[in-house]
């Protein structure tokens, strides 16, 4: 019998809290990971936890990181993710973009210094639910694939 969404989300949150992630960040990250699993994006849901744990244990991410705005204008912002997982900074960035777009008609917000941010569709859905057009993208984790008809890897996958 499949677990309920709330049990699924709560289990992920418990793991993140056990790692030392602040409560609000753990709840938000668990929501995004659970959303991915619920929407069939299994590659970006709870299956990511072992990889995130390796990053944490190898001190490649800060589990207690908090996003901060480094620079902003009425239509843009640059967010620093503090070296942590990317879910919370990405959600924060989209919420910032939505607020700015409501006032100015459009906005662009970038995030730097963060790790994997999960399923991109979660963030674009935030904009759609706000009645806006939204776009989210990420950088690639290195050269991994060959371009169409190419023989050598030259591109990242994101």
PLM regions and their residue ranges:
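Conserved catalytic cysteine-centered active-site region
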Residues: 96-109
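N-terminal amphipathic/basic leader segments beginning at the initiator methionine
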Residues: 1, 32-35
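Helix N-cap / loop-to-helix initiation motif
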Residues: 21-26
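N-terminal amphipathic, basic helical "cap/leader" segment at the start of enzyme domains
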Residues: 35-49
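Active-site cofactor/substrate anionic-group-binding motifs, chiefly glycine-
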Residues: 45-98
């Amino acid at each position: 019998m499949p677990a309920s969404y709330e049990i699924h989300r709560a289990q992920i949150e418990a793991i993140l809290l056990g790692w030392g992630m602040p409560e609000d960040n753990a709840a938000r990250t668990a929501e995004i990971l659970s959303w991915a699993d619920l929407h069939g994006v299994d590659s970006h849901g709870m299956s990511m936890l072992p990889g995130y744990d390796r990053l944490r244990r190898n001190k490649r991410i800060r589990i207690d990181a908090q996003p901060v705005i480094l620079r902003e204008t009425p239509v843009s912002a640059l967010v620093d993710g503090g070296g942590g997982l990317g879910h919370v900074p990405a959600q924060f960035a989209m919420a910032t973009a939505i607020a700015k777009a409501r006032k100015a008609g459009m906005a662009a917000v970038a995030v730097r210094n963060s790790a994997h941010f999960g399923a991109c569709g979660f963030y674009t859905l935030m904009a759609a639910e706000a009645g806006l057009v939204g776009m989210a993208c990420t950088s690639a984790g290195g050269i991994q694939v060959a371009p169409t008809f190419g023989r050598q890897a030259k591109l990242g996958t994101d």
